[in-house]
Amino acid sequence: MTIATPEIQQRVQQLRQQLQKANYAYYVLDNPIMEDSVYDQLYRELQDLESQYPILITPDSPTQRVGDQPAAQFNSIRHNIPLYSLENAFNLQELQKWEERWQRYDQVSNSDYVCELKIDGSALALTYEDGILIRGVTRGDGITGEEITQNVRTIRSIPLKLTLENPPSRVEIRGEAFLPLNEFDRLNGERKQAGEPLFANPRNAAAGTLRQLDSKVVSERRLQFFAYTLHLPEDNSLSSQWESLEWLKKMGFLVNPNCQLCPTLEAVADYFRHWETARHDLPYMTDGVVVKINDYALQNQLGFTQKFPRWAIALKYPAEEAPTRVKEIIVNVGRTGAVTPMAIMEPVHLGGTIVQRATLHNSDRVSELDIRVGDTVIIRKAGEIIPEVLRVLPELRLPNSRPYQMPSHCPECGSTLVRPVGEAVTRCVNSSCPAILRGSVVHWASRDALDIRGLGEKIVSLLVENELITSIADLYQLTPEKVAALDRMGTKSAQKLINAIEGSKRQSWPRVLYGLGIRYVGNVTAKLLTDNFPSVEVLSQASVPTLASVYGVGEEIAQSVFDWFKIVENQTLIEQLKIAGLQLENIASQAVSLTPSSGNIAGKTFVLTGTLPTLKRNEAKALIEKAGGKVTGSISSKTDYLVVGEEAGSKLAKAQELGITQLSEADLLKFLTN
């Protein structure tokens, strides 16, 4: 065996320290201190030295994250301290009752709380001796878990060696391993290409990954880990949960940056309400908030029930997945002629609302699910207005059920349905189809388009059924007398609607273009186009290459706009709208350039709050990101700008407290183009 000289030993130690610092900076601080190429070079040097001098290999070496051989099986390990479940609260009233309960139990009047986002992953218990990771164990049943140390080593945000000069002789760290959403999408994309079953959600993917016998597979899936508590059997110097979180950071762990110390239950409620919406901007799944009494002495006094700690509770968000039964399958024809199958279901509570229908997207999805009337299904709502069917439970299927067949003819007009080559969507191509007309008019009247108050789906349906309109332009030929003759429409209501329609003539050219409903043209794209093509005449004469040359407009959008203006019926519509007096060109005061300039935005961090006057939140986010900026969901010292709309929430107060610059939508648009 080759003997390692003191110089070699020193070099190995230097390499390990440099690589460990780089790992900590990259995975925990999110602040890289080393180029990838430099890291790879140092890693390879350490690997070569350890290969030449195996006696120098230690468990905390960065090269030992991935084991050479798959494990034959996992051993069961009994937890020194049980990993208890948490009692659940499903609304703020139940949270209030929990506080009243523990206060009665201990006769204490108040306490501050630590709020932590409840990560949807797998709980782990990690044991360190003299600062070195020696064991990683799953939660299991809370009493006994599986030892998966070899897999735990592959998680880059778990330090193999604690970053303390004098680490405790023994400490147990607890936290949650999870799969970030971008990794979940990547993993399922790869599995789909390989013809493998898809993971239902990131939690299942994380749990399945941790139980892989081959740690190389685990390493490739890029799990993350948030630490949330520690147990020091030989030291009781820590006095609070908040202090423990600070210690975890010093030890080299990634602690969720969105944890918050709340002085009262009202502050806890504010935290919960904020994240109920803001969680959809996070890069990982969270299904609630964990609320803990901060003071350890009080925790010890309260103790545990047989199942739960009395000093903590999980405040869950309204369910976003739920089972229900399919009563009927129908198809809906939209304004573009797209035929969307819909499942009509028994009512079920989901995401805080009662849901009775869910989208099935298209015929391919119907075939993939093999969904049938009478089936029990799991439906999901993750921020969408209309929930979707996630999966069917075939084991509960009725014996006489029949596969669903998509219709061959439009249920509205009877025309033969077509499926264009290369598309998943079946369409009705009859431009006179009542469903297409209804959808087009509703879109034209929508808030982001012409904003015609009072012209909703019911009134539009009456106008179409009574043949008072056959196109958008016919709206401007309506009279109060014709409208008043409709069911449940009196003279006053009719005049009010006519006034709203007349007022829509003053809406800007960008809104009119968006209202036309050209495929792929959202309101941001409409602003981009009308900035570069100041009138309908200029836009309608533009070639595909000219259209595509506009920043933010690609070939697909350009082709769609070009094709729309070549259709005779659409040319007629434009002429009728001109005669009616609609704004089909930019007025000088309306012309606002939306071509982002990366000079002012690149590298800056933005947070959005409240409702913006014209831009939707995802559109503002897209504009910022196109210009090289970053949009996050919460305020911190790293935030450069807060974009403020109407009904701004707690983010505004926090930004003012931190001295962060606030921008209106107008400020943002100027900033983008300056």
Curated annotation (Swiss-Prot):
Residues 596-674 form the BRCT domain. NAD(+) binds at D36, S37, V38, Y39, D40, S85, L86, E116, R139, E176, K292, K316. Keywords: DNA damage, DNA repair, DNA replication, Ligase, Magnesium, Manganese, Metal-binding, NAD, Zinc. One of its GO terms (biological process) is DNA replication. PROSITE patterns: BRCT, DNA_LIGASE_N1. It is an enzyme of class 6 (ligase). The keyword Nucleotide-binding does not apply. GO terms for molecular function: DNA binding; DNA ligase (NAD+) activity; metal ion binding. It catalyses: NAD(+) + (deoxyribonucleotide)n-3'-hydroxyl + 5'-phospho-(deoxyribonucleotide)m = (deoxyribonucleotide)n+m + AMP + beta-nicotinamide D-nucleotide. This is DNA ligase. It comes from Rippkaea orientalis (strain PCC 8801 / RF-1). The lineage of its organism: Bacteria, Bacillati, Cyanobacteriota, Cyanophyceae, Oscillatoriophycideae. The gene is ligA.
